Amino acid sequence: MSFSEMNRRTLAFRGGGLVTASGGGSTNNNAGGEASAWPPQPQPRQPPPPAPPALQPPNGRGADEEVELEGLEPQDLEASAGPAAGAAEEAKELLLPQDAGGPTSLGGGAGGPLLAERNRRTLAFRGGGGGGLGNNGSSRGRPETSVWPLRHFNGRGPATVDLELDALEGKELMQDGASLSDSTEDEEEGASLGDGSGAEGGSCSSSRRSGGDGGDEVEGSGVGAGEGETVQHFPLARPKSLMQKLQCSFQTSWLKDFPWLRYSKDTGLMSCGWCQKTPADGGSVDLPPVGHDELSRGTRNYKKTLLLRHHVSTEHKLHEANAQESEIPSEEGYCDFNSRPNENSYCYQLLRQLNEQRKKGILCDVSIVVSGKIFKAHKNILVAGSRFFKTLYCFSNKESPNQNNTTHLDIAAVQGFSVILDFLYSGNLVLTSQNAIEVMTVASYLQMSEVVQTCRNFIKDALNISIKSEAPESVVVDYNNRKPVNRDGLSSSRDQKIASFWATRNLTNLASNVKIENDGCNVDEGQIENYQMNDSSWVQDGSPEMAENESEGQTKVFIWNNMGSQGIQETGKTRRKNQTTKRFIYNIPPNNETNLEDCSVMQPPVAYPEENTLLIKEEPDLDGALLSGPDGDRNVNANLLAEAGTSQDGGDAGTSHDFKYGLMPGPSNDFKYGLIPGTSNDFKYGLIPGASNDFKYGLLPESWPKQETWENGESSLIMNKLKCPHCSYVAKYRRTLKRHLLIHTGVRSFSCDICGKLFTRREHVKRHSLVHKKDKKYKCMVCKKIFMLAASVGIRHGSRRYGVCVDCADKSQPGGQEGVDQGQDTEFPRDEEYEENEVGEADEELVDDGEDQNDPSRWDESGEVCMSLDD
């Protein structure tokens, strides 16, 4: 194969479009020289597209220039080849041998043809426009044409190519091997003829990159030189770094905007991680992958629009709720009144540092004195947590620059204030059975409504616990862990709140088959019947009597048992083997009388000193119940135990410290009072008011007469089951007793919605709310003046319900003054007195209610010895 044939094939493959060296069968060769391209090859080729109406020559010039080229002689072409090759050598570093001279024509020197052929190939690869050498039939003896200038890619300059590449990076998107363009016009498929020759038409171009000096884009491949053969062309390769940038059509900021978005770098596809659930995550296999194909189409702006549309869809929000619920960890070790704070938070660290400063006395600017004990603290912490301290330190004594750094509080609950102070510095409120009342009292005094409400919920849960017939036989309340334990030892669910610190007395489990003979009263009890006196008296486990012998390391529990069978007794005995349990026993005080005619056997329990209390130990047998007194002569008729166990031998009195209350024997040789079993199936034991001044209530069987006439002529059978543990007030209804207890606790649980002032009664809040209203509804009945406050209307030493103002009360005018102006009273000197008398008035009203409840004329005379417990 000659060098000229190699040159032709190389030029045809590179697409340079050079004028060949020898004439032949070219369409533009009139001399009939050799064709510029190699002969047709047997490889498959694409069918040639229809020729355009006016096909431009390879170099993009017109018909005049083509005629001019045809008129050139071969000598002219050879003469022009030398300088062109030299210029190209200076512009590009050619791979020439070291012993070779400068580039010459085909006939210059021994190595001239080889160097010229290599020069032609290099120029054809670099610029695509080198002139042909040798005998060209189309030249007609004219000089050889000059080599084309250096062209980049499709004939454009370096600056143009750089600008186009920079613009192409932001517009064209390569994905899955295809080009995604922002252009709204339809791109023509195939190759287009650029500004180069027809053989160069294989370069890919979009509608914005149509090359040439006004050249038209044509589908298919260009027509090469020769006998109309089509030449297979290849698109020009782009830099690898540019292709990587074009393929990256995903924005990393989308992952922050849409947390549900999942992106695959391998496939370039996006999907929703919440809507598309795999079978491992609990999703269905039949469900199509939602959002896998829909979110991967279009341009970048269109994709983000699809993401936003999917984000606000209803179906996605449903999956979003389920995904968020699954991410929330389950809470273990739930506690109602004490939650563990986040130790890594700034707030926790700040409070801990302030608490350490308080304990060490650093920068403490106030001393709080409570019952002689001094507490160091910071004013800013106290003001931030208590409305009382805020009023004390911020709104009072503004005229004195040097305020007193010592504050005395008129409260006696030292332990309660210590808990409140720890709460202000830690955020944790520690409530136990011993300090709940004190903490609530101190919080009410300091006007901390949230703490008061928490204490109320704590106490309310305790009051709601009662021993009923359907209740379990044994309940253990562990105050250290504050978790209930059933009889089988299993802990109940966390939502069950056990916070009881009131001991509910229970009359239960008298001895089975007990034969009692005393003064003609013979009763044979055939079966065990439980009588329950619910909430008859409350005993606080934190009282001094209860706390005398309690050690700090012991677990305090209350146990209510039903000892009806031997099997239950054995189970309870096994469970309580290693426990220190508290037992509550009703007290029967002594009396000097020597007979049982009155049958007054007991009165409401009173906390007796431990040294005067006879204690009973629990034994597994229930055959008999006998209690020996100090003189040892007699046996008590029956004993009443809240957690009743009896002595097996029936004669030993226990000396253990497990029992705080016991049966008190009389000083005489005879035991005058005891429990007498009844004969009725409905009520075994009932309370009846006694005739003696010492004992008002006693137990007697139902078979006795239901009405008795005593010395004072009163007759009734009533059981006053609700008695105040702090005073002698006895209520008939539970709600009345709760209102009465507010007098002793001093809890101000009702607050004004406008100013936040606390009150003990709801009616006091309603009356106080009139102060904030513009309506003046308080009018003096004498002078007809209208006042803003109810405290301004009232007699000085009487109740303000009479509606007489202070001035009229001082003047003691019986008549009225009709013509006095109905002006607003701007001064209210009795406001402080009104606030001070609020609690006193509540006391008067509650005492009146108590007197009405104890009125014998209003007692229930239905004939029942024991009233219903569910009033």
Swiss-Prot record:
Biased composition (Gly residues): 14-26, 126-135
High-level lineage: Eukaryota, Metazoa, Chordata, Craniata, Vertebrata
Compartments (UniProt record): Nucleus
Composition bias, Low complexity: 27-37, 77-103
List of residues that carry Phosphoserine: S210, S565
Organism: Homo sapiens (Human)
Xref: Pfam families: BTB (PF00651)
Keyword Transcription regulation: yes
Protein name: Zinc finger and BTB domain-containing protein 10
Keywords: DNA-binding, Isopeptide bond, Metal-binding, Methylation, Nucleus, Phosphoprotein, Repeat, Transcription, Transcription regulation, Ubl conjugation, Zinc, Zinc-finger
Biased composition, class Acidic residues, residue ranges: 65-76, 830-854
One CC-aspect GO term: chromosome, telomeric region
C2H2-type ZnF: 722-744, 750-772
Highest taxon of source: Eukaryota
